[in-house]
Amino acid sequence: APDIIHATTWAIPPTSKPLAITVHDVAFLRDPDHFTAHGTAYFHRALEITRKRADAIIVPSQATADDCVEAGLDASLITVIPHGLSHTPVTDDQIEDFRARWDLTRPYILWVGTREPRKNLPTLLAAYRQMEDADLDLVLVGPAGWGSDPTDAPLAPDRVHVLGRLDDADLACAYAGA
């Protein structure tokens, strides 16, 4: 049997064991309109469970630690441990193959995330439109989320590439090729 349970997300299991919880952010408190009502309620319940039951709280940054303290979590339980990094070596041939498969012939700006309101994609797209003279494409990687998807609107098809979710190998190539 485990000596400790580590909940790496807000999906906190019931347990009588010591409990460590990773809190990636508390954005639902700062920008509740960027979440569904169901999502906001879920996160509030998880925050309350964290407040009552956590024996240790892991956060990725000092900013998140400060937000957690402001949200009522015990500062003495919080430890900052930055998110890890996975270095996947990518060859020039792999990048060339990736770019050819996705018809990426020009240099590009890469955005990776879930396409949903809290990611503020409309602002990125508006900024990109102001760069129309730049010889840069915009590559959007990641799945559609909830709410309106700004990529449903007409985009410059030869300059804005919506790739959707990529496997790890292609994602590494997308980063390396940007």
Model-identified regions with their sequence ranges:
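Carbohydrate transferase catalytic cores enriched for Leloir-type hexosyltransferases
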Residues: 1-178
